[in-house]
From Swiss-Prot:
Single GO MF descriptor: 5'-nucleotidase activity
Keyword Metal-binding listed: yes
NCBIfam families: HAD-IG-Ncltidse
E.C. number(s) listed in UniProt: 3.1.3.-
Name by which UniProt lists this protein: 5'-nucleotidase domain-containing protein 3
Binding-site residues for Mg(2+), renumbered to this chain: D50, D52, D337
């Protein structure tokens, strides 16, 4: 029986090594727009945008600034040991979408079924052995009542916090660095206090204006020049589309950034500009009225009866916004990078169409397009298929072979994980399952893309169609990949610039 199993193994291995070269010519376009829900740009009359990581993209220096400033706040204001100052920001440590167990001080990746991906649980800067994780959680499943709340936050009864926005990468890294220092030096500490102190320090970097002043003082260092952003806004304006901006950032910060990215006449492109909106409260709290922001940031006390083009408004709420503009339902498309704060309420409660900006998408697709990744994934699928078919052989000799295959399968999984991030892998997958992050992305975003510049690849009559993937009980009659191979069509490359 061992010989029969090995011959099947070798046959699958041979077929993988002889993969049709045409597969390498049918790669995904990193600049494409991907659809979770069918949507036509022809139906969109109004385009809305967040500012940070949607219109404005930041350099790597910004996360270092946030990390260093928050670390120093812990030392100077919360009396943390000065020795933590030796820790520096590592941009390759954390990824977006991770969960943090506030009471256990553990950072981890969780899949769409609430299962922890073993091998991605970190205490400090070191991975926790799988056996210890299973003992702590009595398995690898996290019950619903322990998960983060609707907006990814840790609240009463929820012991998990999910880090969803790009600004959270320094926060995760700082949490793990301070944890690491305490553990290495055998210092007894309360994990809840550490979490709250780091959270407050990170918040102070924003709320006290430290980040805003630093960026405004050296805008070329921190903001990536937005020539493509300017092109997108200009094209939409030339096609007669209404546009608005709703951001949590302050007026002077947005103004300086947009002057740099678009030009001093940037307000001429927008019909409505709202700053310090306090999303997601902006979408739910009816009590806060708009205030007009005059020159030099002076707030006027006039009652707002109209939202005027060329003016800037602070706070307010979506219900008043809808009343004053009449922009309702599926004719509005809003873009943001934060799945919860920017998109969730809009799609669930107000019927707006939503677009998620996922900067990590491009680098992940570029990895998936490599021949090494393609062959590794093909072998992983082939090996999994072998295990599924050959598990019926229960004799001792066959089971020894199967155990070797199971071990190799896990090693191959670990290899694919490290291709994206050595600690946590892809932000979209936990082994074979989607991540919790992707589950929320799929639910709250009609379309998603690496940046707004992807819109330049499509005309404004384009309809985005989600790929039909067979359900587990459905027969895969003809996949898109097979169709593309048949007609030699490069996937995701059938795009035309806006004219």
């Amino acid at each position: 029986m061992r010989g029969y199993l090995n011959s099947n193994y070798k046959e699958v291995k041979r077929s993988i090594n002889e993969l049709d070269p045409s597969i390498s010519s049918n790669l995904l376009n990193p600049d494409a727009i991907f659809a979770n829900n069918e949507m036509s740009l022809e139906d969109i009359e109004v385009y809305g945008f967040d500012y940070d990581y949607t219109l404005a993209f930041y350099s790597k220096h910004l996360h270092t600034l946030i990390f260093n400033t928050a670390r120093d706040i812990l030392i100077n204001e919360h009396r943390y040991p000065k020795e933590i100052q030796r820790y520096e920001y590592d941009p390759n440590f954390a990824i977006r979408g991770l969960h943090y167990d506030v009471h256990k001080a553990l950072l981890m990746k969780i899949d769409s079924f609430h299962y922890i991906q073993l091998g991605t649980v970190y205490r400090g800067l070191n991975v926790v052995p799988d056996s210890e994780v299973i003992e702590m959680y009595e398995g690898s499943h996290v019950p619903l009542e322990q998960m983060s709340d609707f907006y990814g936050k840790s609240s009463e009864g929820n012991t998990m916090k999910q880090f969803m926005d790009i600004f959270s990468l320094p926060e995760m890294t700082l949490l793990c660095c301070v944890n690491e220092y305490f553990l290495k030096n055998n210092i007894d500490y309360e994990p809840v206090h550490l979490y709250k102190d780091v959270k407050e320090a990170i918040r102070d970097v924003h709320v006290k204006g430290i980040l805003y002043r630093a960026v405004e003082a050296d805008i070329e260092r921190y903001i990536c020049y937005g020539e493509r952003t300017q092109a997108v806004l200009s094209k939409l304006s030339n096609h007669g589309k209404k546009m608005f901006l709703i951001t949590n950032s302050p007026s002077s910060f947005v103004n300086k950034g947009m002057n740099f990215i678009v030009g001093k006449d940037w307000r001429d492109l927008f019909d409505v500009v709202i700053v310090q909106a306090d999303k997601p409260n902006f979408f739910n709290d009816k009590r806060r009225p708009f205030r007009k922001v005059a020159e030099r940031g002076i707030l006027l006390w006039d009652k707002i009866h109209h939202l005027e083009k060329g003016q800037t408004y602070k706070q307010g709420n979506l219900f008043e916004f809808l009343k004053l503009t009449g922009w309702r339902g599926s004719k509005v498309l809003y873009f943001g990078d934060h799945i919860y704060s920017d998109l969730a309420d809009l799609t669930l409660k107000h019927g707006w169409r939503t677009g998620a900006i996922i900067p990590e998408l491009k680098s992940e697709i570029e990895i998936m397009n490599t021949s090494h990744y393609i062959k590794t994934m093909a072998w992983l699928q082939g090996l999994t298929g072998l295990l599924e078919r050959m598990q019926v052989y229960r004799d001792a000799e066959s089971q020894m072979v199967l155990q070797d295959w199971i071990k190799e399968r896990q090693e191959t999984r670990d290899l694919t994980k490290t291709m994206f991030n050595r600690q946590f892998g892809s932000i979209f997958r936990t082994d074979h399952n989607p991540t919790y992050f992707l589950r929320r992305l799929s639910r709250f975003a009609d379309i998603y893309m690496e940046s707004l510049s992807s819109l330049l690849n499509y005309d404004l009559h384009h309809t985005f169609y989600p790929k039909r993937t067979p359900l587990q009980h459905e027969l895969p009659v003809c996949s898109e990949q097979q169709y593309a191979n048949t007609f030699r069509i490069p996937l995701g490359r059938e795009t035309a610039p806006i004219k």
